[in-house]
A protein has these predicted regions:
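Active-site beta-loop-alpha junctions enriched in small/polar residues
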Residues: 18-20, 43-45, 73-75, 101-103, ...
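Hydrophobic faces of well-ordered beta-strands that scaffold small-molecule active sites
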Residues: 13-17, 38-40, 68-72, 96, ...
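Glycine-rich, positively charged N-terminal anion/phosphate-binding segment
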Residues: 1-3, 18-94
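Alpha/beta catalytic cores of nucleotide-metabolism and tRNA/nucleoside-modifying enzymes
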Residues: 1, 9, 13, 19, ...
Length: 324
């Protein structure tokens, strides 16, 4: 067990916050497969302060989702401090996470996300302001650095700890790398040796063996699975088994995986409405089609889906093909 502030994490694997991915239905799937901590999609602190209804909706969580974190992004200490309690209230989360790692251009241009790694003094003031504003533990997610010539993860981690963060998550790539190349697990190991708060290792966990290896190699307290979970929430079960030195469970049959994908979208429709859920299904459902015969044909149908009935028809057609 790992403690993040006063919150107990009963397992080694956590789900990364990912925009457009980690909504409540997907988090529920990952939790059912052994994710010990889940996190909302990142939301704009400024949008929360402006009481944007769509932003509030992104934070919606079922009452039984614990332990859980809510993630906000922004660079203005006063705005972040005002938004932090709101994020916890709307989500019911136990932990408040600050995004200082997002590499996306529109986020960077506003001075948010990993742009804060270029201004550690401001980043520290943001963390201090948020820590003072909430009773919950505050965590920070960041990267190796801005680029190859500006690798400052160790010093940044120490700053986070000094500013009051209860834990940190480190992605082993720079902002300039985005998601290209290999994640540098050495920098995560260096960070772990430099701080006393829990360290969460993130980057290139695509198998159960990867999950076990990153924890052994870096000495990190927890491992955070991101893109590896796309269409594969069962990765958490395999990772937990590998870490425990047990045989990894087999993937469920393709028919069951496709059914899980459909249930995910149906759950999303209950929360967001059918139209938005179907728009998101155009990418999310396709992740589950790996290994399906004629997958490209089905993908061409899915990317035009507008109703749940259409998606159900495609799902049943896939299942018929798999049984034949």
């Amino acid at each position: 067990m790992v403690k993040i502030g006063n919150v107990d994490i009963h397992g080694p694997l956590v789900l990364a916050p990912m925009a457009g991915v980690t909504d409540a239905p997907f988090r529920a799937l990952c939790r059912a497969q052994g994710a010990a901590l889940t996190c909302t999609e990142m939301v704009s602190a400024k949008a929360l302060v402006y009481h944007d209804e769509k932003t509030k909706q992104l934070l919606w969580s079922p009452p039984d989702e614990h332990p859980a974190a809510a993630q906000i992004f922004g660079h203005e200490p006063e705005v972040m401090a005002e938004a932090a309690p709101m994020a916890l209230e709307y989500s019911g989360a136990d932990i408040l996470d600050i995004n200082m790692g997002c590499p996306v251009g529109k986020v960077i241009r506003s001075g948010d996300g990993s742009a804060l790694m270029r201004d550690p003094e401001l980043a520290g003031r943001v963390i201090e302001a948020v820590v003072k504003a909430v009773d919950a533990p505050v965590t920070v997610k960041f990267r190796k650095g801005w680029d190859g010539g500006n690798v400052n993860a160790v010093a940044f981690a120490q700053m986070c700890q000094q500013a009051g963060a209860s834990a940190i998550a480190v992605h082993g790539r720079t902002r300039v790398q985005m998601y290209a190349g290999r994640a540098d697990w050495d920098i995560i190991r260096d960070v772990k040796r430099a701080v006393t708060i829990p360290v969460i290792a993130n980057g290139d966990i695509f198998s159960g063996a990867d999950a076990a290896h990153i924890l052994r190699y870096t000495g990190a307290d927890l491992a955070m699975i991101g893109r590896g979970s796309f269409g594969d929430p069962w990765l958490f079960a395999r990772g937990n088994a590998a870490i425990a030195g047990e045989p990894e469970p087999e993937l469920p049959p393709l028919c069951e995986r496709i059914e899980a994908a459909l249930h995910q979208i149906e759950f999303a429709a209950d929360i967001k409405g059918e139209r938005l859920a179907c728009l998101e299904a155009r990418s999310q459902f396709c992740w589950y089609l790996r290994g399906v015969p004629h997958a490209n044909t089905y993908k061409q149908e899915v990317v035009h889906v507008e109703t749940l009935d259409e998606l159900r028809r495609i799902t049943h057609a896939i299942q018929r093909d798999l049984r034949d």
